[in-house]
Amino acid sequence: VGSGNPEEGELRPQLLDRFGMHAEIRTVRDPETRVRVVEERSAFDQNPDECLAANAEQLEALKKQITDAQELLTSVELDYEFRVKISQVCGSLDVDGLRGDIVTNRAAKAYAAYNGRSKVTLEDIEKVITLCLRHRLRKDPLESIDSGDKVSSVFEEVFN
């Protein structure tokens, strides 16, 4: 897991490629949500044990979902047709190397397992592919399209 502030400069592509997935996080703008987050954080800072106890049921359910997914993961199937299409998306986007293909295959299987399925669906791939590929695209200073939008667009072309 890594984090960074894009205002501090970009990472070199060979370093970015080492990250399996890339999530873009934006600051929450809704004032009510911001207040709730600040209140929950303050409550946790004042009494972490109480906060953990109050959320114990949710934490246990999440823990069980993760351990169940780990057990299921080795038996999750990803059809050959989907693997070919994932590689076609990577090729169309001119992704260097094979790491993008590998990570997308693994992430789709993990997401299917997390949702209790033993077979990857189109929706599983759609959910993870942008996270796996957006940071692997070459930056073109003249292009105004967001890299995530570009991945989504190529995904739609290849899979539909």
What spans do the regions from the language model cover?
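C-terminal engagement/docking regions of AAA+ P-loop ATPases
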Residues: 87-99, 110-160
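Short, flexible active-site loop motifs that bind/organize anionic cofactors or intermediates
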Residues: 24, 73, 115
